[in-house]
Amino acid sequence: MFQDKHKVTVENENIEDINYDDKPDLVGISVTVDVYPRAKEIAKRFRVKGIKVVAGGIHVTTAYHTIPDNIFDSLCIGSAEGTWPDIVSDMENNTLKPLYRCQNKIDGDKIASPAYDAISHSEKYLFCNIIHTSRGCPFKCDFCYNSSPDRTYSVRPVDDVINEIKAAHSKHIMIIDDNFLVNPARMREFLKAIKPLHLKWHCAISINIT
């Protein structure tokens, strides 16, 4: 999702202090419900300096209607792959909108891999090598965030997933799909492809496996 003309830095407050002395053109914050109060504080620190702040993530996607208009400059609803290029373009043209919604389902081969190379001081991180083979879930259980109308289900090509696993250079992979066993035929294809790598891995599946 990044272009060569853009310099991107990823900061994680769990590892290091946020550099508020930096003066980026745009700040993006991924928000879950547990970090929402802290996300508001971070946004305020940057916005008082005139820096635009965009919030996205699962909490914004599922509960954007609960977020006051004066907390962030813009909200990103749904998959960032379908909204981030427009957000950056509008920011550059000084036409940033208050809300961006991914209008189309993102095909699995368009799901972006984590930009680990953009993390500053990466030597401080212990990567657990998490992998998405899909995003979302075809079921709409009432208790789950996947019941949101802005949540869609997309499946990545098996070859694409295997290439990311190989790039991780790890013998222990954590698959964090919301529901790994949706398509048994695809699962068998994946198992056949991953077996020669001799990995330890785990995942979550739905109760209908029983």
Regions found by a protein language model. Name each.
Residues 2-110:
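Glycine-rich beta-alpha loop elements in corrinoid/cobalamin-binding modules
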Residues 112-210:
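Radical SAM [4Fe-4S] cluster-binding motif and immediate context
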